Structures are given as structure tokens and as C-alpha cells.
Amino acid sequence: MTMTATMTTPLVLKLGGALLENETALEQLFTALSEYKSTSSRPLVLVHGGGCFVDELLAKMNIVSEKKNGLRITPFSDIGYITGALAGTANKVLMAQGLKSGAKVVGLSLADGGIATVTQSTAGLGAVGECEAGDPTLLTALLSGGFLPIISSIGIDAQGQLLNVNADQAATAICETLDADLVMLSDVAGILDADMQLIPEMNSNYAAELIAAGVINGGMEVKVKAALKAAASLNRDIKLASWKVPERLVALLNGEVEGTKVSS
């Protein structure tokens, strides 16, 4: 199944990178979403990170942030700050742009209505969560009512612990919850090869080769693995593309080929 095969299937857009601190780009994104919704009844869901806001806040607090294998290490003493940056500032910045565009926005975290199941990571990253599909009831009701859910990557486990979830992994879990399509928007056009050229199609074998060679690493490795997981569990292609070409966003949402297509 591909994105063009079922245009009534919910579409999850994962937003990341410098987009969240670029007001002009956000306005262009929501303008494109508004244009798309004027001609399509397809439900949309936004899932976001907000590393730029986390970095800015931690720097003001004189806290040094570290990453391990592309994932942010989150000391338990810092999770309150990170929750504020992601579920607070980042989420409300996106909600503000959505409201300006005329959308009926609802700000959520991964814990609301059990839309995702979050458990603490065992990778020695601190207050970091692993994310799996949850209960679709709340999201289905919101989408049926014409709302645009905007979901931060903050979760809460069964013990009530706040956890920071990688936004790519969070978006994958939300797709699994809704049986939705997924487009990951970031600063780059898609997955790039060793010569920094766009790779139009990617599968698990090719990804393993590029990861072993060090071509795909850090945050892109996390993103690619999340996309591969989604492609396998949903049995459909996932797209990685850039938000930097706003005039192509509507075409991308309509299923036209942009960026890198990831299949299992």
C-alpha cells in the first residue's frame, strides 16, 4: 500500500529541525496545510520534537546537553525543563501558527488519552522513553470533529514518570495507532549518500549498508530506523522530505514523489 492508494487514510506529518524556530517557514507550512485541506478531506496529525527550544533553554540554565547514538541523554533532573520546552513552548508555537491559519488545533502529548504507550528506555539515556502504538479513540474522535491534533514527543509511563521520546519514534507510534501514512519533514531533502546526493528510494538492506559504512549516522540513523519500522509495521512506504521548498508541500501531501521513499 502506498500513500497514493488511499487518500482517506490519516496522514501524520513529523515536524523537526530548524523549522520550529523559523516563523516564516511555519507560516508557509500552515498555509500549505490550509490549501491542502481546502481540497482534501484527509485527516492530518502533526507530531513534533523541538530540540532547538530544548538547547536554548538548557543553555540559559548552563546545562550541557549530550547525545548518544543520535538520541538526547535526559537526566531525570532535567526532564521538567525538557517537558516545558517540548510540551510547552514548541507545542504552543505550532498551535499559534495553526490558529493563525484558521485550523481547529488541539495540543497534545503522547500521554493524552493513551494515544501512545511509553516505557522507559533501557539504553542508559536517563528519562528517555520508548514508544509504541496506543489507543486511537481520542485521536479518531478529534479527527472526526475536524480538529488538527498537534502532538509533542513527551510521554508518561505507567509509573507516572515524565519521559522524553525521540520525535521520529513518536511519529511512528502515532502512525501505528491510527494505521496512518507518515511523512517526516526535516532540514534536508531526504536521505543523502556519501556524495551528499539525494537517495530517491531506501530499503532495510540498503540502509544497513549505509549505516555500517558510517554514511547514515546520528540523528539521521534514528530517523531512518524509525521510518523503516513504520514501513514494516504499516506495510506502506514512508517519505522523508524537506520543509524548505514550501511550493512543493501541497504536491508532497497529495502523494507526489518528493524526497526519499522508505520501504521495508
Swiss-Prot record:
The keyword Nucleotide-binding applies. Pathway: Amino-acid biosynthesis; L-arginine biosynthesis; N(2)-acetyl-L-ornithine from L-glutamate: step 2/4. Substrate binds at residues 50-51, 72, 164. CDD domains: AAK_NAGK-NC (cd04249). This is Acetylglutamate kinase. It comes from Moritella profunda. Catalyzes the ATP-dependent phosphorylation of N-acetyl-L-glutamate. GO terms for cellular component: cytoplasm. Pfam families: AA_kinase (PF00696). It is found in: Cytoplasm. Belongs to the acetylglutamate kinase family. ArgB subfamily. It catalyses: N-acetyl-L-glutamate + ATP = N-acetyl-L-glutamyl 5-phosphate + ADP. Its EC number is 2.7.2.8. Keywords: Amino-acid biosynthesis, Arginine biosynthesis, ATP-binding, Cytoplasm, Kinase, Nucleotide-binding, Transferase. It is an enzyme of class 2 (transferase). The record marks 14, 223 as: Transition state stabilizer. GO terms for molecular function: acetylglutamate kinase activity; ATP binding. It comes from the Bacteria. Its main location: cytoplasm. The gene is argB. The keyword Kinase applies. One of its GO terms (biological process) is L-arginine biosynthetic process.
